[in-house]
A protein has these predicted regions:
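Alpha-helix capping/helix-boundary segments
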Residues: 8, 42, 74, 100-101, ...
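Short, well-structured N-terminal submotif of metal-dependent ribonuclease cores
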Residues: 1-38, 47-59, 130, 135
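Active-site neighborhoods of divalent-metal-dependent phosphate/nucleic-acid chemistry enzymes
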Residues: 66-115
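Nucleotide-sugar donor-binding loop of glycosyltransferases
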Residues: 12, 40, 71, 116
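Phosphate- and divalent-cation-binding pockets in alpha/beta enzyme and binding domains
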Residues: 45-46, 55, 77, 122-123
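A generic structural signal for alpha->beta connector loops
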Residues: 33, 62-64, 109, 126
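Acidic, PIN/NYN-like endoribonuclease modules and their adjacent C-terminal/linker elements
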Residues: 1, 102-135
Length: 135
């Protein structure tokens, strides 16, 4: 299973001028190798740009993405990684979701497609990422 970060789905669904092509190429390549998945956190983040759950579901169907429920071990790992981040001076807002996403990919022993590799590499050493070469 290959996990997909929120930004990759948003890039393609909004036809982002800077990232849509890269993100679409990664999704196309990945889906030929393994099933694509997100967790509940990514679903919640995607809902911000939609009016109804059916719209989020349609996005997932469009890209062939399934929802993989977050295991408790991943929730625990996310909390511990976020704790390290805060102790290192990280802000309280806007990043906790990334820790849930990264921890889930680690516990599932999965690859994560994202444009934001830095934080994942720092707090989840050894995580396998597909990122743009600029990261």
């Amino acid at each position: 299973m290959i996990f997909v970060d929120t930004n990759v789905i948003i890039d393609v669904s909004t036809d982002d001028s800077a990232w849509a092509d890269w993100s679409q190429e990664q999704l196309d390549s990945a889906v030929r190798r393994e099933p694509l998945a997100i967790n509940e956190i990514v679903y919640a983040e995607l809902s911000v740009g939609c009016r109804f759950p059916d719209e989020v579901d349609a996005l997932l169907t469009r890209f062939g993405i399934v929802i993989d429920p977050t295991p408790r071990r991943a929730l625990f790992l996310a909390g511990k990684a976020f704790q390290r981040y805060r102790r290192a001076g990280g802000t309280r807002t806007g990043v906790l979701a990334d820790f849930f996403i990264g921890a889930h990919a680690v516990i599932a022993d999965s690859v994560l497609i994202t444009r934001d590799g830095g934080r994942y590499r720092t707090y989840f050493p050894g995580i396998e990422l597909i990122t743009p070469s600029v990261n």
